[in-house]
């Protein structure tokens, strides 16, 4: 989402940040984490998984931050981890997530930070993948399920659209998932692989640049102003590509062996839109390695209405909204979530991988909570409880403080300083504490 770049303008001067944090740049190889209760998950169905995953949180704007444009590629992992304004990730953050009522965490990653594909280097820097593994281990040790994906990554998925760049797209795709999949193939079943973020769909035809090399698509320019018939044809093409690479992904991960044969795999929806994903043109892959058990899930995001959940201030495409909750707005949200029953009815798990209410920007440049945010989030969580979806809030040190924050100390330097750890506001804390799997399970048992 564009909202993930909210820090970009304000943090441009911090691109040469200090890396004198708590993590040494010295390379360390983490151990392979295996849960003591892994046997419970080996033969678990996707619909059982989404129930025990409870509700979760994203480690946003952290390992997904893209800094290659000014930092370069294959640098110290902390340079990317800091470059969108987030503090260095610490183990204590994950125990705090668990104590706050979260049962799962999504760790978005931009792997191309650690590669240099513009110059033909497709090997992930070992320091970077080891840093990701350290963070994954901390989350698993805190008894959290973990979703690990390929996130922004400079929008390279646009290579899948035009036929002339599709071969290169598969080269990048193979490089990422051959290395990531193999690295984590013996990890606990509580680690879930998500094939991509929001790029599967219209993102196949998105102009982008990486490493000084520009990729453009005439389709991107024309599609939004095209006729309804042309737009339908464009979507049909995107649905076909999703089906092709989705199947390719499942077959690839299963063939890696180890626990990847039965690992839960999360498939991105079309633009992660509930409406486009619920469309019958979207097809889930076949999972021939698990014909008698459902191990696949589908990922969608929820930011609606956009003027309320995405905008922090007025934009060219809309005026910021600071209230939500009319009968019509509630009805529309409920209808959005009801669409995804198409998948649960077929035995597939549904992950609402992101949802959030943007903070409201004040005239002095500070940000405050919007009116009715608790009402909006409560209704989202109620819908997820009703339909057995697993929701994960998009979080970037806003509602939930990570114990550290990144602070500018000069024009060219910043550092991490201590701050609160956990939810700052009691109403938000209570909302999520009451939605943990343990609390909801206890409530059902007592009925």
Predicted regions, residues:
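Active-site region of glycoside hydrolase catalytic domains
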Residues: 170-329, 335-358, 386-389
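N-terminal carbohydrate-binding accessory modules
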Residues: 25-104
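Acidic/histidine-rich helix-loop elements
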Residues: 59-89, 117-124, 165, 307-332
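An active-site-proximal structural segment forming one wall of the substrate-binding cleft
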Residues: 37, 84-105, 115, 120-152, ...
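Catalytic domains of carbohydrate-active enzymes, especially glycoside hydrolases
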Residues: 88-110, 336-344, 383, 387-390
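C-terminal motif of bacterial Sec signal peptides marking the signal peptidase cleavage site
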Residues: 17-18
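Surface-exposed, active-site-proximal loop segments in enzymatic domains
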Residues: 69-78, 111-130, 153-169, 201-220, ...
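Aromatic-rich peripheral "rim/lid" segments of glycoside hydrolase catalytic domains that contact
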Residues: 362-447
């Amino acid at each position: 989402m564009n909202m993930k770049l909210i820090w970009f303008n304000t943090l441009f001067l911090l691109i040469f940040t200090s890396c004198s944090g708590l993590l040494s740049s010295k390379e360390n190889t983490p151990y392979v984490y295996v849960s003591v209760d892994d046997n419970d998950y080996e033969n678990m169905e996707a619909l059982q998984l989404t129930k025990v995953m409870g509700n979760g949180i994203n480690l946003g704007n952290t390992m997904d931050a893209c800094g290659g444009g000014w930092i370069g590629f294959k640098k110290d992992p902390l340079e990317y981890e800091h470059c969108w304004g987030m503090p260095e990730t610490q183990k204590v953050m994950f125990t705090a997530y668990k104590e706050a009522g979260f049962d799962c965490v999504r760790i978005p990653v931009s792997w191309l930070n650690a590669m240099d594909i513009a110059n033909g280097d497709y090997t992930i820097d070992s320091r970077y993948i080891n840093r990701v593994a350290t963070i994954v281990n901390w989350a698993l040790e805190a008894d959290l399920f973990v979703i690990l994906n390929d996130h922004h990554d400079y929008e390279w998925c646009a290579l899948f659209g035009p036929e002339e760049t599709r071969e290169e797209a598969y080269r990048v795709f193979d490089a990422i998932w051959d290395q990531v999949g193999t690295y984590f193939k013996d990890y606990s079943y509580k680690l879930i692989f998500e094939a991509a973020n929001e790029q599967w769909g219209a993102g196949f035809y998105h102009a982008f640049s990486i490493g000084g090399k520009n990729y453009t698509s005439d389709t991107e320019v024309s599609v939004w102003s095209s006729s309804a018939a042309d737009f339908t044809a464009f979507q049909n093409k995107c649905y076909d590509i999703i089906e092709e690479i989705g199947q390719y992904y499942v077959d690839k991960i299963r063939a890696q062996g180890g626990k990847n044969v039965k690992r839960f795999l999360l498939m991105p929806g079309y633009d992660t839109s509930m409406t486009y994903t619920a469309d019958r043109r979207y097809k889930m892959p076949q999972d021939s390695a698990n014909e008698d058990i459902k191990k696949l899930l589908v990922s969608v995001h929820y930011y609606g209405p956009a003027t309320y959940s995405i905008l922090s201030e007025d934009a060219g495409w809309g005026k910021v909204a600071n209230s939500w909750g009319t009968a019509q707005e509630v009805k529309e949200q409920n209808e959005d979530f009801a669409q995804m029953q198409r998948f649960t009815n077929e035995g597939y798990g549904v992950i609402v991988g992101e949802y959030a209410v943007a903070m409201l920007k004040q005239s002095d440049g500070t940000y405050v909570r919007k009116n009715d945010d608790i009402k909006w989030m409560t209704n989202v969580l109620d819908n997820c409880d009703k339909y057995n979806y697993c929701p994960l809030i998009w979080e970037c040190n806003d509602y939930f403080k990570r114990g550290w924050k990144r602070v500018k100390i000069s024009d060219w330097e910043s550092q991490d300083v201590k701050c609160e750890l956990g939810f700052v506001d009691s109403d938000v804390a209570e909302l999520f504490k009451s939605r943990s799997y343990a609390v909801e399970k206890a409530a059902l048992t007592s009925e």
